[in-house]
Amino acid sequence: MRVKTGVVRRRRHKKVLKLARGFYSGRRKHFRKAKEQLERSMYYAFRDRKQKKREFRSLWVVRINAACRMHNTSYSRFMHALKVANIELDRKVLADMAMNDMQAFKSVLESVKEHL
């Protein structure tokens, strides 16, 4: 009997099983289970790339708010004052300042103090 998909099937299986490394038990060793788990993992990866952006933004907000409250103001008032003072620093930079360079964050806070 002639096998028409011998090389092609081997390559396809090899590719799927290579991508399934690190999965648990049969999901790593058996082609069908590996393929199903791979589809699910690709779905998770796609979904979580979007979720990651939301999670980081909320983390930055929490950090900025904590730093603001140390200086007796709130996050919302601080962000409004930044907008009024026409200072265009994004939340990522502000959160990094709040965590690693408190002096710089304090100077930004002082510069918008009149707009609070």
From Swiss-Prot:
Which superkingdom heads the taxonomic lineage of this protein's source? Bacteria
GO BP terms: ribosomal large subunit assembly; translation
Q: Which GO terms describe its molecular function?
A: rRNA binding; structural constituent of ribosome
Q: Does the keyword RNA-binding apply?
A: yes
**Which SUPFAM superfamilies does the record match to this protein?**
Ribosomal protein L20 (SSF74731)
Keywords on this record? Ribonucleoprotein, Ribosomal protein, RNA-binding, rRNA-binding
Pfam families assigned to the protein according to its UniProt record, in alphabetical order: Ribosomal_L20
What does the entry list under GO cellular component? ribonucleoprotein complex; ribosome
What job does the chain carry out? Binds directly to 23S ribosomal RNA and is necessary for the in vitro assembly process of the 50S ribosomal subunit. It is not involved in the protein synthesizing functions of that subunit.
- Stated family: Belongs to the bacterial ribosomal protein bL20 family.
Q: What is this protein called?
A: Large ribosomal subunit protein bL20
Species of origin: Helicobacter pylori (strain HPAG1)
Task: State which gene encodes it.
Answer: rplT
